[in-house]
């Protein structure tokens, strides 16, 4: 069956070339990890009865511009980092970021080793069976990266019969496997996908638009380009343990506060070079 995508055109983003500091890994689906056990041993401070609590935040810090570690300071930086710190400030709690593998985030939430997960996570009905999500804080989607001199792929339909690179277990892999007659090549890391594209071993990479854009600008060296069309439209949310209504309430309240006072828009423009969509601010 031919894969049919709705085309959602995105606004161009202006990027600051800070260097592609860490390998990017595309967000992976949670379906295979729901029953996995977390390996952490420290109970989050959220459970302690202190006047000012510390929110333990889990993220895979290999997803610039959402989250990464500065190569010099070793501090966590990115859109997700700034958003959760701003929410913490609005709600009066401290934030401690812990770097976990993406596929360990849901298990860590379920066992209480982290309080929230913020990691370019798409809100979906399947994931909502395991965790509760905040209101959206970013509108994303899957995009396409091709070599700069490629003129044969300009839209979703052009992917038919092509060689497509995706990272294992990702939403990009799921989409690629629906493309008619496509040869899907699966890699452990997203950076391997981009390298294979530049070596002309594949025709295109399917991956999230923000990380596509970041790679093209900071590490593509003019040899690749991101197409100005999205294959899907996805809302990103902050995940909390299923049933933790009090924490979810505070996260949503803090998110609403920073959207209203202008801090959200300031952070958004810092990392994406443009103002957030009006519909994103209206939630």
PLM region descriptions:
Residues 27-31:
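N-terminal export leaders
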